[in-house]
């Protein structure tokens, strides 16, 4: 099953800020992850987050694109069969987690 993909408006802006060649690599990665966005413990690609850097990111997943230094945080919407992308960034883990927490609160995710 391929899961649907939704971007928060801010995540779309994150994508647009990336260099075009990086965007292509990230989109390929997102397509691959959408085939199985579940946690690694369930055979998927996502690494579950919890309480990171003084932020509660429980029920969120992360993917690192190591070759290009990009991190992506997303939430699995099981009922809708959608992975909702919250942040895509080249920032450090701490910065990405803080931004994900902020967006989660703003959008009540």
Name each model-derived stretch:
Residues 1-32:
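Arg/Lys-rich, positively charged N-terminal/basic patches that mediate binding to nucleic acids
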Residues 5, 42-43, 97:
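Non-catalytic, surface-exposed connector residues within folded enzymatic/regulatory domains
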Residues 13, 58, 65-109:
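Enriched for short, Lys/Arg-rich terminal
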Residues 18, 33-37, 107:
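Solvent-exposed amphipathic alpha-helical surface segments
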Residues 21, 52, 63-66, 91:
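Surface-exposed loop/turn and secondary-structure junction residues enriched for glycine/proline
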Residues 34-64:
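A short, surface-exposed loop/turn module that caps and links secondary-structure elements
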């Amino acid at each position: 099953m391929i899961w649907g993909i939704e971007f928060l408006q801010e995540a779309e802006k994150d994508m647009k800020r990336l260099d075009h060649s990086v965007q292509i690599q990230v989109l390929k990665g997102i397509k691959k992850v959408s085939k199985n966005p579940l946690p690694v413990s369930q055979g998927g690609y996502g690494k579950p987050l919890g309480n990171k850097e003084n932020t509660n990111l429980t029920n969120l997943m992360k993917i690192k694109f190591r070759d290009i230094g990009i991190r992506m945080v997303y939430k699995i919407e099981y009922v809708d069969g959608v992975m909702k992308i919250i942040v895509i960034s080249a920032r450090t883990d701490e910065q990405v987690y803080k931004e994900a927490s902020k967006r989660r609160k703003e959008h009540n995710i």
